Regions:
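One-carbon transfer enzymes
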Residues: 1-116
Length: 116
């Protein structure tokens, strides 16, 4: 097992997730978990690659969504990659994982951030 553990969070097709999977063998990292906030194609990508997946449906969890999200992240995680993850991560989670979260949003969040 690789020494650098990554948790990927996605909400859609899983294109960025698949790209991260395809490059694991070239770099020293291991994708240990996928977290999604809805049923989406990224789940299929995880299943095809034997990567554990946790589905936390925001519409059902409501206010407890981010509490469950925080619990789902393993303590040995080195990096969280938001790969097309729609929910806007609250400050408390950003503070806990300071300098360990990357957002792959394809545009300026201030201009095109959506509702989250």
């Amino acid at each position: 097992m690789k020494s650098f553990n990554i948790v990927v969070c996605a909400s859609g097709g899983g294109g960025n997730f698949r790209s991260l999977i395809n490059h694991q063998s070239s770099y020293d990292y291991h994708i240990s978990l996928l977290i999604v906030d809805r049923e989406c194609k990224a789940i299929n990508v995880a299943n095809e690659n034997n990567i554990p997946c946790i589905v936390l449906e925001k519409k059902f969890l409501g206010d407890s969504f981010f509490e469950e999200f925080a619990k789902a992240i393993p303590p040995d995680t080195n990096l969280i990659v938001l790969a097309g993850f729609f929910p806007i991560i609250p400050q408390c989670i950003c503070d806990k994982w300071e300098r360990k979260i990357i957002n792959t949003h394809p545009s300026l969040l201030s201009e095109y951030g959506g509702k989250g």
